[in-house]
């Protein structure tokens, strides 16, 4: 007969689906339900506990980590006499903390563009439907400027912080960097360098979306986070134009962090 679903039933479901328990290279650091189904699978549930059913199934997300990585930190923890080490996927944590439960009822796209690495994830329920990472970020904008103008990286970083892609510059416009404006850069050239790098980042985001299998139409927003390009004025609008999708910057709903 039907019985109420309990924590033990959910735990058993997660255990049955984990095929990485004895994997030589990877270990599971988290398992999260995208959704649950009961009996005839005609309905999806976010929370099945307490519901009477004969059978529970579901789509579960397993987050993996290389054993070489976990072994390193477990040895450090052992030396420090720490009893336990917990590993958390950063983009999973972003999805859970920055997107409301109502939004996560449907699949959502997060693009975390960092300084030198970026990730694109499809989030649903309490899990990740897909995750792609690539070695590109806002730091590459500064690197391109330093290389093209043959200036110190510190000066290129300073210029990057002044970029404004929303303004219409002319040939007389310039950015300054260094002590007493030691370095001058054509604003037109700097902006073109930044746009070129953003084009590449947008291309990788598009490829990641395609690989995920998520059918994201022109009205499907891309939630942008990370400090790589969100601080570049006009970058959000430019990426939206290139990707042909609305871009929304998301940040923690905490004073001084919600910008």
Where are the model-predicted features located?
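Gly/Thr-rich phosphate-binding beta-strand-loop-beta motif of the actin/hexokinase/Hsp70
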Residues: 101-131, 145
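Short glycine/threonine-rich loop-to-helix capping motif typified by GTGT followed
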Residues: 100-102, 230-240
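Conserved phosphate-binding/catalytic loops in two-lobed NTP-binding clefts
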Residues: 240-259
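Hydrophobic alpha-helical bundle architecture
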Residues: 210-215, 222-225, 248-254
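N-terminal phosphate-binding loop and adjacent alpha-helix
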Residues: 1-14, 144-147, 151, 256-258
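Phosphate-binding glycine-rich/basic clefts of nucleotide- and phosphate-handling proteins
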Residues: 62, 67-75, 92, 124-203, ...
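Flexible loop/turn segments at secondary-structure boundaries
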Residues: 95-96, 230-232, 256-257
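Nucleotide/phosphate-binding catalytic cleft detector across ATP-hydrolyzing
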Residues: 1-108, 166-172, 177, 187-191, ...
